[in-house]
């Protein structure tokens, strides 16, 4: 093994770079050419632009958006339960009797 010179940066040490340049070949020998070739060719990892994937959305369900702990009771009307026509008749009869007072 070559002696390591502390005065030279690690990337400039002898044997730190391959003697041949990287190429576009994907054969086994070229895939193991250097660490960069192994990552790009062997593992298929590149730092290029990544494709944008659409988000997965769940189908809209109104039950998903409600509070499951509290179910509020239906509002109960207060007072007498009467038909609207009957209530109009009562109001008319009251107004007629009040007019004579």
UniProtKB/Swiss-Prot annotation:
Location of region: Core: 38-48
HAMAP family: HIV_TAT
Domain remark from Swiss-Prot or TrEMBL: The cell attachment site mediates the interaction with ITGAV/ITGB3 and ITGA5/ITGB1 integrins, leading to vascular cell migration and invasion. This interaction also provides endothelial cells with the adhesion signal they require to grow in response to mitogens.
In-chain residues carrying the UniProt-annotated modification N6-acetyllysine: 28, 50-51
Keywords: Acetylation, Activator, AIDS, Apoptosis, Host cytoplasm, Host nucleus, Host-virus interaction, Inhibition of host innate immune response by virus, Inhibition of host interferon signaling pathway by virus, Interferon antiviral system evasion, Isopeptide bond, Metal-binding, Methylation, Modulation of host chromatin by virus, Modulation of host PP1 activity by virus, Phosphoprotein, RNA-binding, Secreted, Transcription, Transcription regulation, Ubl conjugation, Viral immunoevasion, Zinc
GO biological process, one term: DNA-templated transcription
Lineage top rank: taxon: Viruses
Crosslink position(s): Glycyl lysine isopeptide (Lys-Gly) (interchain with G-Cter in ubiquitin): 71
Record motif Nuclear localization signal, RNA-binding (TAR), and protein transduction, residues: 49-57
Function (record text): Transcriptional activator that increases RNA Pol II processivity, thereby increasing the level of full-length viral transcripts. Recognizes a hairpin structure at the 5'-LTR of the nascent viral mRNAs referred to as the transactivation responsive RNA element (TAR) and recruits the cyclin T1-CDK9 complex (P-TEFb complex) that will in turn hyperphosphorylate the RNA polymerase II to allow efficient elongation. The CDK9 component of P-TEFb and other Tat-activated kinases hyperphosphorylate the C-terminus of RNA Pol II that becomes stabilized and much more processive. Extracellular circulating Tat can be endocytosed by surrounding uninfected cells via the binding to several surface receptors such as CD26, CXCR4, heparan sulfate proteoglycans (HSPG) or LDLR. Neurons are rarely infected, but they internalize Tat via their LDLR. Through its interaction with nuclear HATs, Tat is potentially able to control the acetylation-dependent cellular gene expression. Modulates the expression of many cellular genes involved in cell survival, proliferation or in coding for cytokines or cytokine receptors. Tat plays a role in T-cell and neurons apoptosis.
Pfam family, one: Tat
Protein name: Protein Tat
Compositional bias ranges of the Basic and acidic residues kind: 80-101
Protein species of origin: Human immunodeficiency virus type 1 group M subtype K (isolate 96CM-MP535) (HIV-1)
Modified residues (Asymmetric dimethylarginine): 52-53
Region spans: Interaction with the host capping enzyme RNGTT: 49-86
Misc. remarks from the entry: HIV-1 lineages are divided in three main groups, M (for Major), O (for Outlier), and N (for New, or Non-M, Non-O). The vast majority of strains found worldwide belong to the group M. Group O seems to be endemic to and largely confined to Cameroon and neighboring countries in West Central Africa, where these viruses represent a small minority of HIV-1 strains. The group N is represented by a limited number of isolates from Cameroonian persons. The group M is further subdivided in 9 clades or subtypes (A to D, F to H, J and K).
Family stated for the protein in its record: Belongs to the lentiviruses Tat family.
Sequence segments annotated as region (Interaction with human CREBBP): 1-24
């Amino acid at each position: 093994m070559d002696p390591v010179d502390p005065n030279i940066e690690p990337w400039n040490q002898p044997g730190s770079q391959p003697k041949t340049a990287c190429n576009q070949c994907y054969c086994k020998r070229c895939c193991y050419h250097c660490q960069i070739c192994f990552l790009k060719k062997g593992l298929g990892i590149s730092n290029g632009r990544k494709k944008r994937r659409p988000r997965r959305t769940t189908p809209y369900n109104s039950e998903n958006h409600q509070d499951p702990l509290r179910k509020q009771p239906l509002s109960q009307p207060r007072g007498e339960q009467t038909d609207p026509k009957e209530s109009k008749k009562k109001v008319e009869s009251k107004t007629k009797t009040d007019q004579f007072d």
